[in-house]
Curated annotation (Swiss-Prot):
Residues 723-767 form a coiled coil. It is found in: Membrane. It comes from Dictyostelium discoideum. This is Uncharacterized protein DDB_G0293534. Keywords: Coiled coil, Membrane, Transmembrane, Transmembrane helix.
Amino acid sequence: MYIQQSQIDVNSTMIKPLKNSNGISNSNINSFSIKNDIDSNINSNSNNIGNGNGNGNNSCNDHKNNNNNNNNRISPTLSSSSSSSSSHTTSPIIPSSKLNSNTTTSTTPTSTTSSTPTTPTITPSSPSVLYKNPMEFDNVFQFKEVLQRVLDSQFQSDWVAIIAKILGYILPNNDIVLRKCQNDEDVKELLSLLRPSSQLFRMIIENFTNDSFQFYFPFDRIPKCVIFDITIKNQSTPKIINQININQYKKDIVVNMFQYFFFAFGLFPDHLNLEMQLLPANLNNNNNNNNNNNSINNTLNSIENKFTRTIHGIPTFSANRQNSGNRLSSSTGFNSQRIFSGSSSSSSSGSSQTDNSLLFNYQQQQYMMSQKTKSIYLRLLSEYMDFFLPFQRSLIDGNLIIDPNRKLMVNHDMSLTFLKIITESLLGHNLLNQSLNILNQFNYSLLSSFKKPTPVYLSTIQTFITYFQCYSYTFNYLSPFSINSPPSSPSPSPITSNGNKSTTATATIIQPILMTPSLGLFFKQREIVSSGLFEYFVSYFERLDPNDQYLPIDKILNIWVGWLTPWDPNTRTSRRISPNVLQKNNKSTSSFQNLLNLTSSFTHSIGVVGNSGGNKNSNIGSASNLLVLNQEYYSKWENYVIEHYYFYSFIFNLLLIRSQSLDITSYLYIFKSILNIFNSPVLKSLLKRISKHDSIIVQQQEQQYQYQYQQQQQYHYQQPQFYQQSQQQQSQQQQQQQQQQQQQQQQQQQQQQQQQQQQQQQQQQQQPQQPSQQQTPSVSSNYIDVSKDILLRLEYQIGFYQIREFINERNLFSELMVSNASRLVDILTLKINQQNQKDYLEVIKSLCTFYDFEEPIIKEKINNTTIINNNPNDINNANNSNNNNNNQSQVLLSPNRNKDGTLNDMGRKQIYDGKVICKPFDSNYPYEKLISQPLVFEKQPITSEEIGIIIKFGYMLTDNSQTRLFIRKLARKKLLFSLVLILAFIWFFFEIYFFFTRK
C-alpha cells in the first residue's frame, strides 16, 4: 500500500536529524576541520541509511507505482512494508506536484536492527515545488531563519526548495536570495551564510558520501559532456553522478546533497545572463497560472522590443513607441507603467518623458541587480576554490609561494569531485564533432544541440582559469614525466610589484622531487581542467555559426591567450589575489564596493583586453606576455609549452580556418596580439622544435603501420625461407644506412654549432669595451636534439586529447597549416580598404613572418579600389574587371545589415568605430524600395543624402510614426533643394509682379 500525498507546511514540519553511528546529531556540529582521514568520519554517517515512504513526481518523466526491493537500487516510491526495516529514521517529505490536495500522511519511525540494508529515497525536483513552496522571505535576515529551520530538520525534502531559493531552478526570477541584497550588511550576512565557514557548507561536506538522501536533478540542465562521458565512455571517476538512466521513456539523473549543490552552483551563470530581462515580482504573483505564463512570454518579447533604442546616434525607433505600448497592454493585460514601476496605474498614456524615466530606472535597476548577483557569485566561487584547491601566500607581501612538497589538507576525492563538477558545468555544454559521429540517432537528438557561451559564463570561466593558474604556479608547473629529475635552472623567488625579487618569501629550490599524494592530486586536477578547456575551445570553433553577428570570439580568444601565456607572475597572479590588496580596498571603500572591485580584479583578463571594438592600447603582445631568454626565463615555461603544445597548434589551426569565413574586425586587435606572441623569437623556436618532434611521432606511427601491414601479409601468405632471409638482410642494411645518415647529420650539426660559438667568441673579443651582459641560452632552430622526454609528453597528449588521426591539423608547421595561413592572407588582401588597411597589413605581415613566406603585393589593389570608390558615377562605363572590383569593395565598405537592408547592432558599431562607411548609393541594398515599408523606412540609417539635424530633432519631438515618416521624407536634400528652388522662383515672380504694378 502506497502512502498518499498530503498538504504539508514545509517550514513548520520538523523532522528528526539523521544521526551517525556515534549517536551525535549532524546539526549540532560547532566546529569543523578538514583532515586527510575525513573519509572515515564521513563514511560513518552512512552506515545506518534510513528508508522513507513517498510518492515523487519528476518533471522529466513519471515514476509512479514502482516498488523496487533491491538493496542497491534507488527508487522514487517505496511501499509501506519496506519502512518497517528502517532504523532511527523518518520518511522524508516528498514534494508533490499539487500541494493543495486534501489527503493525509503519517511518519512513524520504527526501530529495527541496523544490519538490514535499506534503500534510500529520491526526492524529485519538480517545478511545482519551486513556485508553490511556502518558503517566503523578503530579505537576507529572514532567509537566515528559513535556512536554520532547514538545517535543523536535516534537509529532508526541503533541500530542493532551499537550493532553488539560493541558486534558482531553470527560469530567471527575482525570488532568489542573491537578488535580495540591498546594502553592505545584506552582502556580509549572505556571504557568512554561504561561504566555506558556514554551517550550510559544513553540512554539505559532512554528507559528501552520504547517499541516504538523493535527488533527481533536471536532465535539461546537466552538461552534455557529463552524459556523454558516463553513458558512452563509461567514465566513473571521480563520481559526480550517482545514477543515470536514459532511454526513450525516462531520463533520470540522481545525485546526492553534495553533487546537487555544486551542480546548481556551477550552472548558476544561466541565471546571471545579463542579456535576459527579468520580470518584476508582481508578475510572479498572478493567480491564473495559464494566463500568467502567456503574459510572461509576451511581456518578455515586448520588453526586448522596447530595449532596441537608438544606438550611437543613429535613430532606430523610440523606446516608448505607442504601438509597442498598446501591444504590450493588450497582450498581457497590464499597463506599461504598471510593469516598470511595480504599482497599478490608470490605462491612460502618460507623457513621453515620464515613460522614458520609468524605462531608464527599470533598466538601471535590473542591471545593478544583475551586477550585484554576479559579484557575490564570483566571490563565492573564489572562496570555494580556495577551500578545495588551497595555496600559500607570504605573510608580508602576499606573493605566491612555490612549494610542490606541501601537504594539501583537503580530502582528495572531495577536491576532485568539486573540480570536475565546476569544470563540466562551465565548459562541458558542447560535444566535439568526433564525439557526435559515434552517437546513435536517439543520443544524437539529445546531445547534438549547441549552447552559445554567454558573457556571464565567459567572465566566470576567466575567474576560474585565473585561480587555477595561481594554484598551478605554486606547484611550479611540474610535469609527471620530469618530477624525478632536478630542474635545469633554479626556481625563481616571488617577484614584487616593483619588479624586484622578494627576500621575505620562503620559496626555495626544489631538488629531485618524488611523487607525493599532493602532486598526484595536482596532476589529476590539471588533467580535468586541461581536458575540459581543450574540448571547450575545439567544440566552439568547430560548431560556431558563421552567420551569427554576435559571436564572442574576442572573449574566447582572451581566455585562450591567458591559458597559453602563464608567465609574468607579477601581474597575473600574485597581485590579483594579494591580501594587502583586499585590506587596502576595505579601508578605502565600503564592503559592497570592495566586493565589486574584487570581482572586477578577478574577472579582469590576464594581461588581455578583450574589447570587441578593439582597444588599441591592449597589453597583449607586450613585453610581459612575450617569452624571452633572460634571467626571467626558466625551464618551467618551456615545460609548460611542451605540456600544452596542442593548445597552441590545434586551436590555432581552427582559428585560421574560421577566420577565412568570418569578419575579423570584431577580434582584429586580439588576433594581432596573438600573432605577436607567436612571433616572439624564443616561443617560435620552441614551437618549431616541438613540431619537429611531432613529425617524428608521425614517422614512427607510419613505420609501425607498415610493420603491422608486413606482418599481416606474412601471416596470410607464407613465403619461402630464402626470400624471408633476403628481406631481413635488406631491412638490416636499410637500418644501418639510416643510422649512418643520422650520425652524419648530427656531426654536421655539431660542427655548425662549434662554428657559431667560435664566431660569437670572436665578436666578444673584438668588442671588449662594451659592458658585459649576462649570457643567455641560445636556441637554434636548425639544430634539433631529439628528446625522449618531449616525445613521451606529446604521445601522452595525443592519446589524452584523442587527436591521433589529426596528423596535419595538430602540427603547427605542417603543410596544411601553411596552406591555411596563405589562404587567409589571400582573403585578407581582397578585403583591404582605406579603413582597415593598416590593421590588415599588420596581420598579413605577422602571418607571413611566422610561416616564412613572401608578403603579397597589395599596393596596386588598394589604389584601384580607392579610385573606384572616389568615382561612383563612372561604374557603368568601366570594364568588367572594374565592375567586379567595385561591387566587391562596396560589399566590404558597407556595414553589417539585416535581410531587409537595415543596420543591425554590429553595423552601427562599425560605423561608430569608423571601420566602415555607410554609403547612400549601394546596389546591394536599394533604399528607395524600402519606402513602401513604413516601419523599416523609419528605422533606416541616416545617409549623406539626408539632413540629419532635422531628422534627429523631429524624432526627439514626436513618437508618431506617420509624423516621423513625413519628417524623414521632407529631410531629403533633393526634396529640400527643389522646394527652395520653387520658393525662390515664386518669390522672384512676385517681386517682378509687384515691381511692375507699383509703376
